[in-house]
């Protein structure tokens, strides 16, 4: 759930630029929505994702004089996700946390360390080949990864058995490959997977019959459809 009304309203205005969201057309007149219309559909998709994860990812688009300028200090999702991980920090299971953005990775790492988890590693596009080898051979309590660069080609089954997706990926096979990093031969523990999706239930719609959805909910629904299609094709 959204912990800040301003954070919810900002995401709601951004989502109003996406037809599938069913957000009330009255939100399209906002200053931020107007900016996004000029930037095009792909920009709206990116900003909608960022608004669900961490508003500070939008700080350059929001501007200092915007009514949403204070929202950059909020992140309902990261508050929930990191608290959830911290509640499980003493269960003896290594954790893989998959993110999309570098700033998101930095924030997750900082929050986990502040919560008392000392051994937190990072693997993203900034990691060199030599550093990568060290990361892969070090046993961290939590390893935070950028999903697009670390979903394949690495074996992590020896140290990790919990997987967290902070935001869904458009391609379900990317997530399946990410899970495969530790759900493979040699894994001695049950692997648990946690996915986090922001809801649009609190967003305003034009009619009572409409149901507003966030980009994350939309992607999650498309993932399920793709998996069902794949299952039918394989069964036949």
What does each of the following model-derived ranges do?
Residues 170-236:
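A conserved SF2-helicase RecA2
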């Amino acid at each position: 759930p959204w912990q800040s009304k301003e954070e919810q309203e900002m995401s709601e205005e951004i989502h109003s630029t996406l037809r599938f969201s069913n957000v009330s057309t009255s939100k399209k007149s906002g200053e931020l929505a107007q900016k996004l219309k000029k930037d095009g559909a792909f920009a709206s998709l990116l900003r909608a994702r960022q608004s669900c994860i961490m508003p500070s990812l939008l700080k350059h688009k929001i501007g200092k004089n915007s009514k949403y300028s204070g929202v950059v200090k909020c992140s309902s999702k990261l508050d929930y996700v990191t608290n959830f991980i911290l509640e499980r920090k003493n269960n003896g299971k290594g954790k893989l946390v998959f993110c999309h953005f570098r700033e998101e990775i930095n924030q997750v790492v900082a929050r986990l360390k502040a919560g008392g988890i000392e051994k937190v590693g990072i693997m993203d596009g900034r990691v060199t080949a030599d550093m990568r080898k060290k990361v892969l051979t070090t046993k961290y309590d939590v390893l935070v990864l950028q999903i697009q660069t670390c979903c394949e080609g690495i074996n992590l089954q020896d140290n990790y058995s919990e997987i967290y997706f902070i935001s869904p990926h458009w391609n379900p096979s990317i997530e399946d490959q990410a899970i495969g990093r530790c759900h493979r031969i040699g894994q001695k523990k049950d692997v648990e997977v946690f996915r986090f999706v922001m809801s649009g239930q609190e967003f305003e719609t034009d009619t009572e019959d409409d149901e507003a959805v966030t980009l994350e909910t939309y992607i999650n629904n498309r993932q399920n459809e793709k998996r069902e299609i794949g299952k039918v094709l394989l069964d036949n």
